[in-house]
């Protein structure tokens, strides 16, 4: 299971993380880790990671990339399938803590590594959400899965909604965790000029944080150490899924901000307001119009809405309106005192709610 520390953001990263998703593996800046003990954890983690990867890792050639993913459950199960799309700065391991519990109720779980995440590489061109959805459909076709429950967190929620727009017959139901049910820029357009400028400034990171999470490391162990949470004495093998070699060095999240076009306040502003310099991929999340997409909704949709006084994207009212308008299909559940990441803040409640939803969805073999 992914340790809780993998979602515990330090204060200086708070606004940035919540703005573009969830920094799924952050660690404390304050504590110095005993290097000898940590080396033992690292060696053990490497063995665990390799074993886990061998058991659950799959890769399929699709139109644009070799699409990589983790899988749990019976690989012959083509009827009861949940496919999960992770949030920003995350990867397929995001859903690992819940997979086996859902296998127990008869589901096959597939968690995708999106472009430039985990073990899925970037396509050789400026690929959009549409291109990624085509690759995911290709994966489903290869696996002979005619339709599945599609779920996603934050950015992954928007990708899930986009997939439904493009390939509605492939979707038996949707789970949208704090993303994908309301247009991304909705909360920004509610702000006056001063408030908007202040919110955009929160994207800019201090230099020490920038170096720690988006810099280079001399070797894999140093990169592992940078994300290790000393308050949790486990091996934390999932950290290894975030480490990549680059130019004879090692990185963790380097390059991700630029890929989302959310490197700083200027890039964030360009993305929100549709600057033509923004890539097709980065602009994809802004262009999704959930209210329009769900006008003719005819499948069950579960909206999980994180709300708090510090909510970076307050859209409770919009979610409520959407659910009331399509009450036969859309269920809206709010989780209070959560800024964004429900599955971390309330893992048991999250599992309970989605389990109930999955048990209620009517799946066919057609």
Residue ranges and their predicted role:
Residues 146-190:
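Conserved hydrolase catalytic core segment
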Residues 295-337:
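Conserved loop-alpha-helix segment in the C-terminal half of the alpha/beta-hydrolase fold
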Residues 175-219:
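Flexible "cap/lid" loop of the alpha/beta hydrolase fold
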Residues 111-151:
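Active-site loop/oxyanion-hole signature of alpha/beta-hydrolase fold enzymes
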Residues 30-59:
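An N-terminal hydrophobic leader/cap segment in hydrolases
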């Amino acid at each position: 299971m992914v340790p809780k520390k993998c979602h515990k953001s330090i204060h200086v990263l708070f606004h940035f993380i919540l703005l573009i998703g969830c920094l799924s593996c952050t660690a404390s800046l304050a504590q110095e880790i005993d290097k000898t003990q940590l080396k033992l954890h690292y060696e053990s983690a490497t063995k665990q990671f390799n074993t886990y990867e061998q058991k659950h890792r799959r890769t399929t050639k699709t139109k644009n990339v070799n699409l990589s993913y983790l899988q749990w459950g019976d690989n012959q199960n083509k009827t009861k399938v949940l496919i999960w799309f992770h949030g920003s700065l995350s990867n397929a391991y995001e859903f690992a803590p819940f997979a086996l519990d859902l296998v127990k109720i008869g589901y096959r779980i597939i968690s995708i590594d999106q472009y430039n995440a985990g073990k899925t590489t970037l396509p050789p061109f400026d690929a959009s959400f549409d291109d990624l959805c085509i690759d995911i459909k290709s994966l489903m076709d290869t696996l002979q899965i005619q339709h599945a429950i599609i779920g996603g967190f934050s950015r992954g929620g928007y990708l899930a909604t986009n997939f439904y727009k493009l390939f509605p017959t492939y979707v038996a139901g949707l789970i949208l965790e704090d993303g994908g049910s309301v247009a991304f820029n909705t909360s920004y357009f509610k702000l006056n000029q001063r408030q908007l400028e202040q919110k955009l400034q929160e994207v800019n990171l201090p230099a020490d944080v920038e170096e720690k999470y988006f810099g280079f490391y001399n070797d894999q162990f140093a990169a592992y150490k940078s994300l290790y949470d000393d308050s949790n004495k486990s091996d934390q093998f999932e950290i290894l899924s975030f480490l990549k070699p680059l130019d004879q060095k090692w990185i963790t999240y380097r390059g991700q901000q630029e890929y989302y076009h959310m490197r700083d306040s200027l890039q964030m502003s360009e993305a929100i307001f549709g600057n033509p310099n923004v890539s097709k991929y980065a602009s994809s999340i802004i262009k999704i119009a959930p209210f329009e997409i769900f006008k003719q909704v005819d499948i069950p949709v579960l909206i999980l809405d994180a709300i708090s006084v510090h909510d970076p994207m307050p859209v409770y009212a919009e979610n409520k309106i959407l659910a009331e308008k399509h009450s036969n299909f859309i269920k809206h559940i709010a989780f209070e005192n959560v800024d964004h990441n429900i599955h971390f803040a309330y893992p048991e409640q999250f599992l309970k709610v989605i389990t109930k939803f999955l048990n209620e969805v009517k799946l066919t073999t057609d």
